[in-house]
Curated annotation (Swiss-Prot):
It is a single-pass type I membrane protein. The chain crosses the membrane at residues 694-714. GO terms for biological process: male gonad development; proteolysis; single fertilization. May be involved in sperm maturation and/or fertilization. Has no obvious cleavage site for furin endopeptidase, suggesting that the proteolytic processing is regulated. May be the functional equivalent of ADAM 1/fertilin alpha which is a pseudogene in human. A motif (Cysteine switch) lies at residues 171-178. It comes from Homo sapiens (Human). The gene is ADAM20. This is Disintegrin and metalloproteinase domain-containing protein 20. Residues 1-31 form the signal peptide. A tripeptide motif (VGE) within disintegrin-like domain could be involved in the binding to egg integrin receptor and thus could mediate sperm/egg binding. The cysteine-rich domain encodes putative cell-fusion peptides, which could be involved in sperm-egg fusion. Glycans are attached at residues 191, 226, 378, 438, 479, 587. Residues 207-400 form the Peptidase M12B domain.
Amino acid sequence: MAVGEPLVHIRVTLLLLWFGMFLSISGHSQARPSQYFTSPEVVIPLKVISRGRGAKAPGWLSYSLRFGGQRYIVHMRVNKLLFAAHLPVFTYTEQHALLQDQPFIQDDCYYHGYVEGVPESLVALSTCSGGFLGMLQINDLVYEIKPISVSATFEHLVYKIDSDDTQFPPMRCGLTEEKIAHQMELQLSYNFTLKQSSFVGWWTHQRFVELVVVVDNIRYLFSQSNATTVQHEVFNVVNIVDSFYHPLEVDVILTGIDIWTASNPLPTSGDLDNVLEDFSIWKNYNLNNRLQHDVAHLFIKDTQGMKLGVAYVKGICQNPFNTGVDVFEDNRLVVFAITLGHELGHNLGMQHDTQWCVCELQWCIMHAYRKVTTKFSNCSYAQYWDSTISSGLCIQPPPYPGNIFRLKYCGNLVVEEGEECDCGTIRQCAKDPCCLLNCTLHPGAACAFGICCKDCKFLPSGTLCRQQVGECDLPEWCNGTSHQCPDDVYVQDGISCNVNAFCYEKTCNNHDIQCKEIFGQDARSASQSCYQEINTQGNRFGHCGIVGTTYVKCWTPDIMCGRVQCENVGVIPNLIEHSTVQQFHLNDTTCWGTDYHLGMAIPDIGEVKDGTVCGPEKICIRKKCASMVHLSQACQPKTCNMRGICNNKQHCHCNHEWAPPYCKDKGYGGSADSGPPPKNNMEGLNVMGKLRYLSLLCLLPLVAFLLFCLHVLFKKRTKSKEDEEG
């Protein structure tokens, strides 16, 4: 691949731009570390089964490990946001042709957790290979654990990573604090317009950094030219780095991997500043059009330079400066993860720590010298927060699977314009009986995917494809000519349901139902005085919404539409993290509720749901008690001749034995939107419905037999009585 001439030309242009006005480059100096710092200990993790009141919530695993002269109990649960859906992996042929695959990735074997009884401890492990691989941080000590592959007794090796100068020489960033400060002054003038960005939504702390990792050819060769090995190394490193960022409410999500399996398209040895510059140019022309990302990092196995990594400070989302280069010299995952965490911190606006910067440990991740640590300092928090607010919201929403790919082509498992299907790679298509490699249907196949497609054929008309969920929902059936299930339709807003409730957007809500969902079946909605007292306070326990950073007090007419208040609570539920239960005594009443504070990225279980009754002929709509008059009256029971119910598209969904559109003529039910229901009502029943139906059929003979026995017994008693009288 010829890259020399265009790189030189573009490099000169970019140097003039970068030197005067853009982002500073930071670097970590490098030494020649030994393979591991201490002799390992052999440990055998033992699973701990928790019982009784001390049992962990579902989804947690607990193991006991003994090392360093002590026994530790590790609690961990699956890290669910590590990968983007359908993670693409790019490789190259010997002729430098691009190949793309979406390999099966076991996404339920990467864990985050903590050590029992050790505040601020941190655990990041994977169990994908059958044993534990990853990091344990206990107080000021950091350990790396690896399984012994040939062990028949689940043995592992635990290495303590020391910070002694004799084993971990002091390594200095290649950029001085003075130079960073000077370049930041230049950057402030360049980024002036960014300071005017909208602050809407800034209080939601949760951020999602979409990371693409590129692995150079030398590192690939070091991994025995095994792309799968490279992938697993990347997964484990990113899982560890993600654990560093969780206290900042940041999820680092891997959205793609690019492995230079043929050769390096640019020099990766020598001065890392040049490597970073060249990589930024390469990314701009080769990666941006393929993968969505906030930042891209190049992993290299450099053994000549004197730096561990470089990155553009505040480069996040600022193409082409949203890049970093990290030296992955050996197999020490934890040590390299600290380097990646540091360089990614620079991308997010963090500078090197000064003497006034502190964290829970002796050293912090953004220290100018490389230190064994897992915590960010107070300075890093402040710099990240300032940088995130001022640079917009590019890292706020999680990646949507459909947006990961930017290059439309046959073979990416996404059915695009002009394609009948897309079975993916050659290997995947070989196993697909319905779709061909050229994204057309196999001869004789009617479909290749969809709820209403089975064995390459459309499911028969009247096959249930979407079951009714609750009394405010409606079922849908396949039409026999399409692979898709009809759009989801539900009962029209404003139709009564349950007791003193109305359907609204597919659900039946009232205050009592919500209290039972939170506090159990005995709970019920509190008196109106609780709503009046609490929801007019304008705090996290009682409010009618959030504007900017301020909780809005409820006006008296809207108090029933703020936060739900309950009574008759006997049990405090296990709520999601960051949730708080409030008990408030008001005269002879105890009011119970939950909080919702700024920065929470989980659903608010305590806000009164839209559609909840708040007065006669009134329901809550967006924290306001609104009249139901505004709800559509285009369809009413009379429209359906009292033989059906109106759906959200203002069409009649007819009862069985009546036909749409107005339930006037004989038919089989359904609506113009639901697809045709089965002619035999039994065909439309779900599995549970069929079981209940069959159970009833089985009971009928038994009931008949019992009635017969009672009849015989009655006749005998009557005859016996007549004999006695005679």
